C-alpha cells in the first residue's frame, strides 16, 4: 500500500527480532501526521467527540502531569475515533502573562543588560513575540513525542488574533451587562513584580516568627473590666499599626463588651479609632483584642466592610512606607475621615525595616507588653519569590454571583458530571462562596484591557478606540489613553472551549464540536479554570432554543504524580523525572546536571546528587513511549495521587517485548501459510474456542472500564489477557496442533491466531499506539485487510456468540490440572523438563471426559510420560497430591527425589527465612525507626515480613509432605 509507513519493511519475512521503540516511534508519528489521520473525519452524520487540551504555558516544557493527562486524553480520543465518531482533539498554548514576561525580561537582562523599561512597551512586546517564535514551540514538539493524535492544523494560542477578538467581545458584553466593573479592593500584591496576582500564584510557607503584644491606650479615661486603661492587641505585622482604623473584640467577651462603642488612641499616630464588637475576635485566642487594618489584611477588610470603617493604605506599590497615607471610605472613595499623616521617622522605610522601627518605638514608649515566638504561614509570590502584600488597588472585576448560579445548576442537574463524583463537593463549596474575580494585572504581556480614559478620568469601554469614539461622539480633539493593564490569563483560558472553535463567528466547527465531550484536568485548578469556563461558556453560548450551553459534559479529575516515596515532584527536592527521559533514556551524568544545574538553592545540590546516584546508579534506560503510556494508564486510579514506580515502567516495557515476541511467533506460524482466508475446512480446537471466548469477555470488560474512565482497570485487563491468557497459555496450547494437527485443524488454529492477534492490537491501540500500528501493518494482510492504518479501524465489539461456556470451563480445568503439576514440581524441586507419571484419583464423570478428550494436550503441556485415571477405590502409590475440581492429582514420589537430601535443603531454607524474619522484627520493634522512616519504607518492611512468614509456612508444609513419604 502506498500509505504504509515507509520505515516498516514489507519485504522482510517477519518482524525484527528485537522490539526497538526508538526506531519505530518517530517515523510512525510523522507518517500519521502527514497522512492527516488526526483530523476529524468530517462526517457530521456521525456523533462528534471533542476534547480541548488544557493549554500549557508557552514557556513550559513537558512534565509528568502533562504526560499523565495527555495519555488519558489521547487514549479517549483514539478509542472514540475507532468507534467511527467525528473526533477533534485540539491543542494550544497559553500566553502565560507573568511567566513569559519574566522569561524574556531575564533573557534581555542577561544578554543585553537591559530592562523592559529601556525597550518601552511596544518594543518589549515585539521582543516577546520574537521569543515565542523561537522557543514557544518546545512543549508542542514534546507533545508529539507522546504519540498524541492532535489535529495540529487547528493549534491555537491564547494571544492569536481570533482569540484576542473573542476576549474583547466578552469583556465589552460583560461590561455592558454591568458584570464587569472597576473598583478599589484588596488584592494579593507582588511588590517585586508590581502586579496583582491570583491565589494560585501564592505559595504559603511555614515560618518561625514573632507575635508582638502592643498596648493601645483607652480614650476618655475608660477602663477594662480588670481596671486597665489600655487594651493589648497581638499582631505578627506591627508595621501595619500605622493603618489601623479599629480594634475588634468579641461581643460576648465579658472583659471588653462594655467598651464596645468607645475608642482607643492609636500609638505613634495619635488618631482615635473605635472599639467594635465582631465575631472575628476570638475570646480564646491571644488577648481577645484584634487590631483592624482594612487596607492591609483580607480578614480585616471584611470586618471593615461590616462596620463601614475607613481604609488607610500606608504602602507604596514597592512595599515601602508612603510619605502620606491614602484614606478611603468603605466604597473606595477618597475621604478625609482620618488624617493622612504618617510620622516622619517611618516615611520611605522598606516594610520590614519599618517593622523593626515601629517595634522599637513601642518599646521606647513603654507600650510593648511582650514578644512571643510564633509559628506562622507567610504568603510568597511563586514567581517573584517575595512576601505578598494585601494591597488596596484599583482593579477590574467580574461580578460572579449571577454567573455562578447557572454554573452550579448545570452540575446539580447532571448536565456536567465530575469523575470521580466527590469533586462535585469541592466545586460546590467554592462556587457557593464565590467572591468577585479580579481580572486585571499590572503587566505588559497579555490582552490589554479594552478601556480608554479621557483627561477627566471618564472610562469608555469598546472593542477598539474607533468604536469608543463613534459610540460616545468623541471627536479627535478629545485625548484618550488606553488602560495600561492586561487581563488575567485565566480570563482568556476561561473562553477556551468556544473561542478556539471560532466564536463569536457562528462557525461550522462551533456547531459540530460544542459542547465538547470531556475535559481532563488536575483538581488544583477546578476553581481557577474549570469553574470559570463553565460560568463564561454558559453565559455566552446558547443552543438553538436559547438554553445555556455547557463547555463539556464530563470533567475527569486527575491526582498529582508524586515520587516513589509520595513526595511532590519539585526542582528544589531534585526528584523531578522528565517523561521524555523515560522514553529515550538518560545517563546519570546528564540526569545529575538536569537536577542540580541552575538551582535557586545551590546548597541542596549535594543531597540531590546522593539521592539521584542511589536511585539511578546507571541513569535511566530507554523504555519507549508505549511503556510510559501503559504505566500512566495503569496507575490512573480515579482522582487519587499517584506514587511513580519505575518498576512498573520496566514491567510494561517487558509487556511490550512480550507482545512483540508473541506477534513474531504468530507471524512465523502464519505468513505464507493457509490461514483459512480463502475457504477450506476449518476445525477449531478446544484452545481456539477457549481463546475466542476469553477474548470476547476481555473486550466486554475492557470497554466497560474505558466507558467509566477506569483506565487502570482497562490496562490491567489488557495486561492479564495478553500476558497470561494469550501468550502464556494459548500460544503454548497451539504447539501440539502446529506439530501434528490435520490440515483443517492447522487452518482453524492459524485463523484463530490471526483473528485474535489482529483484534487484540485494535483493542490495545488507544493505550499503546506505536507498537500496535507497527505489528498490525504486518498482520493486516493475513486477514485480508487493505486499510492504511489501525487508527481508523473499528474498535472490537463484544460478540456473545463467540463465548463458548463449555470451552471456558473445560480449558480452565485443564489449566488448573497443569498448574497443579507445575506447583508440585516447584515445591519438590523437580526439574521442569523431567517427564512425570501422573494419576487422577476419584475423578468424576466431567473430569474423566475432559481427560479423555484432551489427554495428549495435557501430557504435552505438563510434560508427562503418562496420565492415568485410577479405578474407583484404587488409592494409588505414595504420592504428592493436589486437588482440582472433581479429582485429585497424584505424582508418585518413588525415585523422584532423595528424601534425606531434600529435607536437609528445606531445613537450610527455613533457617535462612528465620534469620530474615528476626532482622525485620527487630527493625519494626525499634520505635525510633518506625517514627522516623518514611511511611512507604515502613510499609515495605511490613510487606517483606508477611512474605517471609508465608514462604516459611510453605516450606514447613513441604517438609511434612516429604517426611511422610
UniProtKB/Swiss-Prot annotation:
Its keywords, alphabetically, are: Aminoacyl-tRNA synthetase, ATP-binding, Coiled coil, Cytoplasm, Ligase, Nucleotide-binding, Protein biosynthesis
**According to the UniProt entry, what is the EC number of this protein?**
6.1.1.9
ATP-binding found in the keyword field: yes
Query: Which stretches of sequence are listed as region Disordered?
Result: 1-22
Q: Where is this motif: 'HIGH' region?
A: 56-66
Q: Which compartment or compartments is the protein found in? A: Cytoplasm
Transmembrane parts of this sequence: none
Give the binding site residues for ATP: 571
- Example of a GO MF term: aminoacyl-tRNA deacylase activity
Catalytic activity, reaction form: tRNA(Val) + L-valine + ATP = L-valyl-tRNA(Val) + AMP + diphosphate
Q: Which residues form a coiled coil?
A: 896-965
HAMAP family according to UniProt: Val_tRNA_synth_type1
Q: Which family does it belong to?
A: Belongs to the class-I aminoacyl-tRNA synthetase family. ValS type 1 subfamily.
Give the PANTHER family listed for this entry.
Answer: VALINE--TRNA LIGASE, CHLOROPLASTIC_MITOCHONDRIAL 2, VALYL-TRNA SYNTHETASES
Q: What does this protein do?
A: Catalyzes the attachment of valine to tRNA(Val). As ValRS can inadvertently accommodate and process structurally similar amino acids such as threonine, to avoid such errors, it has a 'posttransfer' editing activity that hydrolyzes mischarged Thr-tRNA(Val) in a tRNA-dependent manner.
Supply the name of the protein: Valine--tRNA ligase
Q: Which gene encodes it?
A: valS
Amino acid at each position: 500500500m502506498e500509505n504504509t509507513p515507509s520505515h516498516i519493511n514489507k519485504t522482510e519475512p517477519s518482524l525484527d527480532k528485537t522490539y526497538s521503540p526508538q526506531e519505530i516511534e518517530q517515523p510512525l508519528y510523522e507518517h500519521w501526521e502527514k497522512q492527516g489521520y488526526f483530523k476529524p473525519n468530517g462526517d457530521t452524520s456521525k456523533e462528534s467527540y471533542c476534547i480541548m487540551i488544557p493549554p500549557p504555558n508557552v514557556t513550559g516544557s513537558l512534565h509528568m502531569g502533562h504526560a499523565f493527562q495527555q495519555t488519558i486524553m489521547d487514549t479517549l480520543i483514539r478509542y472514540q475515533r475507532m468507534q467511527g465518531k467525528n473526533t477533534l482533539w485540539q491543542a494550544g498554548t497559553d500566553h502565560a502573562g507573568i511567566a513569559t514576561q519574566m522569561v524574556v525580561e531575564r533573557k534581555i537582562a542577561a544578554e543585553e543588560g537591559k530592562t523592559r523599561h529601556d525597550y518601552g512597551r511596544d518594543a518589549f512586546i515585539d521582543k516577546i513575540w520574537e521569543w515565542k517564535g523561537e522557543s514557544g514551540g518546545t512543549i508542542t514538539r514534546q507533545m508529539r513525542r507522546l504519540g498524541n493524535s492532535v489535529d495540529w492544523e487547528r493549534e491555537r494560542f491564547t494571544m492569536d488574533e481570533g482569540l484576542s477578538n473573542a476576549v474583547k467581545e466578552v469583556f465589552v458584553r460583560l461590561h455592558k451587562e454591568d458584570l464587569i466593573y472597576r473598583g478599589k479592593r484588596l488584592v494579593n500584591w507582588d511588590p517585586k513584580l508590581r502586579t496583582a496576582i491570583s491565589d494560585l500564584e501564592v505559595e504559603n510557607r511555614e515560618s518561625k516568627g514573632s507575635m508582638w503584644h502592643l498596648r493601645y491606650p483607652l480614650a476618655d479615661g475608660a477602663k477594662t473590666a480588670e481596671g486597665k486603661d489600655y487594651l493589648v492587641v497581638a499582631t505578627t505585622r506591627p508595621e501595619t499599626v500605622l493603618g489601623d482604623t479599629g480594634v475588634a473584640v468579641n461581643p460576648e467577651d465579658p472583659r471588653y463588651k462594655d467598651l464596645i462603642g468607645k475608642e482607643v488612641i492609636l500609638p505613634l499616630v495619635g488618631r482615635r479609632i473605635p472599639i467594635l464588637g465582631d465575631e472575628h475576635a476570638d475570646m480564646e485566642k491571644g488577648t481577645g483584642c484584634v487590631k483592624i487594618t482594612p487596607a492591609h489584611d483580607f480578614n480585616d477588610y471584611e470586618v471593615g466592610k461590616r462596620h463601614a470603617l475607613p481604609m488607610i493604605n500606608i504602602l507604596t506599590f514597592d512595599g515601602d512606607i508612603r510619605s502620606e497615607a491614602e484614606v478611603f471610605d468603605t466604597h473606595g472613595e477618597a475621604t478625609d475621615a482620618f488624617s493622612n499623616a504618617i510620622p516622619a521617622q517611618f516615611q520611605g522605610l522598606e516594610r520590614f525595616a519599618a517593622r523593626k522601627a515601629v517595634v522599637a518605638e513601642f518599646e521606647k514608649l513603654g507600650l510593648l507588653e511582650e514578644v512571643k515566638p510564633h509559628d506562622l504561614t507567610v504568603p510568597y509570590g511563586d514567581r517573584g519569590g517575595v512576601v505578598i502584600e494585601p494591597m488596596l488597588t484599583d482593579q477590574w472585576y467580574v461580578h460572579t454571583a449571577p454567573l455562578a448560579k447557572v454554573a452550579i445548576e448545570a452540575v446539580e442537574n447532571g448536565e456536567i458530571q465530575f469523575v470521580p463524583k466527590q469533586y462535585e463537593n469541592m466545586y460546590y463549596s467554592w462556587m457557593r462562596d464565590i467572591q468577585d474575580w479580579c481580572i486585571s494585572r499590572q503587566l505588559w504581556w497579555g490582552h490589554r484591557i479594552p478601556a480608554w480614559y479621557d483627561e477627566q478620568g471618564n472610562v469608555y469601554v469598546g472593542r477598539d478606540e474607533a468604536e469608543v469614539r463613534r459610540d460616545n461622539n468623541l471627536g479627535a480633539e478629545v485625548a484618550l489613553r488606553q488602560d495600561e493593564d492586561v487581563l488575567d490569563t485565566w480570563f482568556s483560558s476561561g473562553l477556551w472551549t468556544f473561542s478556539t472553535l471560532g466564536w463569536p463567528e457562528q462557525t461550522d466547527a462551533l456547531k459540530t464540536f460544542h459542547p465538547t465531550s470531556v475535559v481532563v484536568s488536575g483538581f488544583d485548578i477546578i476553581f481557577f479554570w474549570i469553574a470559570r469556563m463553565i460560568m463564561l461558556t454558559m453565559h455566552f453560548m446558547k443552543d438553538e432554543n436559547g438554553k445555556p450551553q455547557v463547555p463539556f459534559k464530563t470533567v475527569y479529575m486527575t491526582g498529582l504524580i508524586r515520587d516513589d516515596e509520595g513526595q511532590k515532584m519539585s526542582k528544589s527536592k531534585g526528584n523531578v523525572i522528565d517523561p521524555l527521559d523515560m522514553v529515550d533514556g538518560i545517563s546519570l551524568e546528564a540526569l545529575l546536571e538536569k537536577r542540580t544545574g541552575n538551582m535557586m538553592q545551590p546548597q541542596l545540590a549535594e543531597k540531590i546528587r546522593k539521592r539521584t546516584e542511589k536511585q539511578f546508579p546507571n541513569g535511566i534506560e530507554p523504555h519507549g513511549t508505549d511503556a510510559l503510556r501503559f504505566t500512566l494508564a495503569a496507575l490512573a486510579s480515579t482522582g487519587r495521587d499517584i506514587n511513580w514506580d519505575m518498576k512498573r515502567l520496566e514491567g510494561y516495557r517487558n509487556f511490550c517485548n512480550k507482545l512483540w515476541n508473541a506477534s513474531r511467533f504468530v507471524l512465523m506460524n502464519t505468513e505464507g501459510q493457509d490461514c483459512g482466508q480463502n475457504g477450506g475446512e476449518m476445525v477449531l480446537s478446544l484452545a481456539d474456542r477457549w481463546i475466542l471466548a476469553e477474548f470476547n469477555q476481555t473486550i466486554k470488560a475492557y470497554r466497560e472500564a474505558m466507558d467509566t474512565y477506569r483506565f487502570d482497570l482497562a490496562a490491567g485487563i489488557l495486561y492479564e489477557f495478553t500476558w497470561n491468557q494469550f501468550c502464556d497459555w494459548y500460544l503454548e496450547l497451539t504447539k501440539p496442533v502446529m506439530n501434528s494437527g490435520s490440515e483443517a485443524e492447522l487452518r482453524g488454529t492459524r485463523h484463530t491466531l490471526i483473528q485474535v492477534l489482529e483484534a487484540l492490537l485494535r483493542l490495545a491501540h488507544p493505550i499503546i499506539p506505536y507498537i500496535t500500528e507497527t505489528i498490525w501493518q504486518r498482520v493486516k494482510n493475513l486477514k485480508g485487510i487493505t486499510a492504511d492504518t489501525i487508527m481508523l479501524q473499528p474498535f472490537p465489539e463484544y460478540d456473545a456468540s463467540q463465548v463458548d461456556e463449555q470451552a471456558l470451563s473445560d480449558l480452565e480445568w485443564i489449566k488448573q490440572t497443569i498448574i497443579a503439576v507445575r506447583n508440585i514440581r516447584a515445591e519438590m524441586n523437580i526439574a521442569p523438563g523431567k517427564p512425570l507419571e501422573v494419576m487422577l484419583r476419584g475423578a468424576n464423570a466431567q473430569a474423566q471426559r475432559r481427560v479423555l478428550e484432551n489427554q495428549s494436550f495435557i501430557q504435552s503441556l505438563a510434560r508427562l510420560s503418562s496420565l492415568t485415571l485410577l479405578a474407583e477405590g484404587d488409592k494409588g502409590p505414595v504420592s504428592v497430591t493436589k486437588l482440582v475440581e472433581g479429582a485429585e492429582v497424584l505424582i508418585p514420589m518413588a525415585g523422584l527425589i532423595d528424601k534425606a537430601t531434600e529435607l536437609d535443603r528445606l531445613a537450610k531454607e527455613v533457617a535462612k527465612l528465620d534469620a530474615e524474619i528476626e532482622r525485620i522484627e527487630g527493625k519494626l520493634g525499634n520505635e525510633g525507626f518506625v517514627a522516623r522512616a518514611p511511611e512507604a519504607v515502613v510499609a515495605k518492611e511490613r510487606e517483606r515480613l508477611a512474605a517471609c512468614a508465608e514462604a516459611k509456612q510453605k516450606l514447613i508444609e513441604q517438609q511434612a509432605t516429604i517426611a511422610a513419604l
